[in-house]
């Protein structure tokens, strides 16, 4: 997985961006190299399209070769250049061509950005009672 950082997301939400015909992109040669020779399955970038060519040749090549991509990615300046594990939470699609997803980078412990969950900072309180599904109420209970 490769994310291309251009800092384009730092200019959001300026309405002038929608009128621009050129923006940072990933060239078709770069896409073919990354997917064909480096064998990545997925890449992401900050602008809302892969490239600013008149026919969006990079985007067309990706879609015709079965590759997925993340568009409109933000905060890449806060992720390390290498060594992060990326978790992608996909939305439930209902017939559309795309949708919003949240990308979370699990970074090395010494990374200066983000949050750290300490041993006493678990998101939920501990309980001696186990959760189980209650048929009558239709939900999990303790």
Residue ranges and their predicted role:
Residues 1-142:
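Active-/binding-site microenvironments in catalytic and ligand-binding cores
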């Amino acid at each position: 997985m490769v994310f291309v950082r251009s800092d384009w997301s730092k200019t959001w939400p300026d309405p002038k961006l929608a009128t621009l015909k050129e923006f940072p992109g990933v060239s078709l040669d770069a896409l073919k190299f990354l997917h064909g020779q480096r064998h990545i399955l997925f890449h992401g970038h900050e602008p809302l399209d892969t490239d600013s060519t008149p026919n969006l040749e990079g985007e067309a090549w990706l879609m015709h070769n079965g590759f997925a991509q993340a568009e409109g990615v933000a905060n890449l300046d806060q992720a390390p250049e290498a060594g992060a594990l990326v978790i992608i939470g996909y939305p439930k699609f209902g017939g559309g061509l795309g949708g919003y997803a949240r990308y979370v980078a699990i970074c090395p412990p010494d990374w200066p950005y983000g949050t750290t969950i300490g041993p006493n900072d678990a998101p939920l309180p501990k309980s001696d009672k186990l959760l189980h599904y209650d048929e009558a109420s239709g939900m999990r209970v303790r």
